[in-house]
């Protein structure tokens, strides 16, 4: 079984799209756990509608310390062998989870490609995932990881507010996990939200690389990435 964890907070505008994408999967051996951070809008009312429709949906609602706190709560509640994570403004492609599970034999982690939804509209562009390596990154929305691997790594390190998923992947590589890649779009990722905070993202990425990679490699990567960021800022002016 695949346990799908969705973190929410005041997500009434986008949540139905995410939940419908789970409900409409061709792969049906799943449970979906919504971990809500005590929303003040109609998020929980929407979740309750889906719980009534299908007993595979579950939820909790209580204050949390951000998305990775919610994700940690979720995997600890999970019953499935595999765990996946979805943002409340993201969605799965219809065949996405099936494609991962069809290629999961012998794997500890399996991941695929991603569509990106542009800011403030529904324009979508395709992004092929690069092979995961130490210091690299792939969208957690398009990745399935065995729950036991998450447990052995202690889950997400919540001191990283943006890229704790990258840190978890690095820890998973270090432990020698078997990671498989497939070339099929698994999810549609919305570029709105915390993950679009570019400079903070670069700083956090450097800290994670410093934890897992040789120092000079980290410095070189940081200079290159920061240089690209500054050039983009200048060109926009």
In which residue ranges do the predicted regions lie?
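Cell-envelope/extracellular polymer assembly enzymes that use nucleotide-activated donors
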Residues: 1-3, 31, 167
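Acidic helix N-cap motif at the loop->helix transition within catalytic regions
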Residues: 13-16, 41-49, 95
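Short, acidic, metal-binding catalytic loop of nucleotide-sugar glycosyltransferases
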Residues: 20-29
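A conserved acidic beta->alpha catalytic loop
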Residues: 28, 36-45, 87-90
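Glycine-rich, basic loop-to-helix element that forms the pyrophosphate-binding segment
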Residues: 61-78
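Short aromatic/hydrophobic "clamp" motif used to bind/position activated sugar donors
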Residues: 83
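Conserved nucleotide-sugar donor-binding catalytic segment
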Residues: 126-204, 208
